């Protein structure tokens, strides 16, 4: 399963990338706002840093305008993935852009039917939002499993990119289900290393080692 970083924080992306943890990056208008930077500037910097797909999102509502914005964003770097919303106009834009050979990430997916339409439109990635479904007492992970099954049933090549990842359990369950990709904030990815028993084990080892009176570097 590939790990994408859901962030426009170049320093945070670079830290994870140095460990080989970054297979791609996803951004959106909210993350660009949080970065406080120009979208073209920060996106270009991320593309220079990361070899994998970097999603940059259109903001237009109409298909023709989305297509023009998508083409403009795609000029930034060869690894740009144009992100479009899962609306009828977004699907129209997806079809045109993928026919032109561009990667497209169809975002804000909340149902199997939407995922089917995106795959039929040739989407490179479909982004179902787990956390936002959980917020309204629906099962976001169940949607990931359902899309995985449907795509496998019909051999769709669209990759399932699980988004709105908020917890380590979301990541573990997506891996079990067979999501192709998860995208998560840097803090969530770093948090995957944490476990209470690891902490307790280290405390015990540190206490026992202190009792030996030794230091490894002085041996």
From Swiss-Prot:
Pathway: Carbohydrate degradation; pentose phosphate pathway; D-glyceraldehyde 3-phosphate and beta-D-fructose 6-phosphate from D-ribose 5-phosphate and D-xylulose 5-phosphate (non-oxidative stage): step 2/3. GO terms for biological process: carbohydrate metabolic process; pentose-phosphate shunt. The keyword Metal-binding does not apply. One of its GO terms (cellular component) is cytoplasm. SUPFAM superfamilies: Aldolase (SSF51569). It is found in: Cytoplasm. Keywords: Cytoplasm, Pentose shunt, Schiff base, Transferase. It is an enzyme of class 2 (transferase). One of its GO terms (molecular function) is aldehyde-lyase activity. It comes from the Bacteria. Its EC number is 2.2.1.2. The active site is at 83 (schiff-base intermediate with substrate). It catalyses: D-sedoheptulose 7-phosphate + D-glyceraldehyde 3-phosphate = D-erythrose 4-phosphate + beta-D-fructose 6-phosphate. The keyword Ribosomal protein does not apply. Its main location: cytoplasm. Pfam families: TAL_FSA. PANTHER family: FRUCTOSE-6-PHOSPHATE ALDOLASE 1-RELATED, TRANSALDOLASE. Transaldolase is important for the balance of metabolites in the pentose-phosphate pathway. Belongs to the transaldolase family. Type 3B subfamily. This is Probable transaldolase. The gene is tal.
């Amino acid at each position: 399963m590939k790990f994408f970083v859901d962030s426009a924080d170049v320093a945070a992306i670079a830290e994870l990338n140095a460990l080989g943890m970054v297979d791609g990056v996803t951004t959106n208008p909210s993350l660009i706002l949080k970065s406080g930077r120009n979208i073209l500037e920060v996106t270009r910097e991320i593309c220079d840093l990361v070899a994998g797909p970097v999603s940059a999102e259109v903001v237009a509502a109409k298909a023709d305008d989305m297509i023009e914005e998508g083409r403009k964003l795609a000029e930034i770097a060869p690894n740009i993935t144009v992100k479009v919303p899962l609306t009828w106009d977004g699907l129209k834009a997806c079809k045109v852009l993928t026919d032109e050979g561009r990667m497209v990430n169809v975002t804000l997916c909340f149902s199997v039917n939407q995922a089917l339409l995106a795959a039929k439109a040739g989407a490179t990635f479909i982004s179902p939002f787990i956390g936002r479904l959980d917020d309204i007492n629906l099962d976001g992970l169940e949607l990931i499993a359902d899309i995985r099954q449907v795509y496998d049933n019909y051999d769709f090549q669209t990759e399932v990119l699980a988004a709105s990842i908020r917890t380590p359990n979301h990541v573990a369950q997506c891996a079990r289900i067979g999501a192709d990709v998860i995208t998560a904030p840097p803090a969530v990815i770093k948090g995957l290393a944490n476990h209470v028993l690891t902490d307790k084990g280290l405390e015990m080892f540190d206490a026992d080692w202190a009792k030996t009176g030794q230091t490894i570097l002085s041996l």
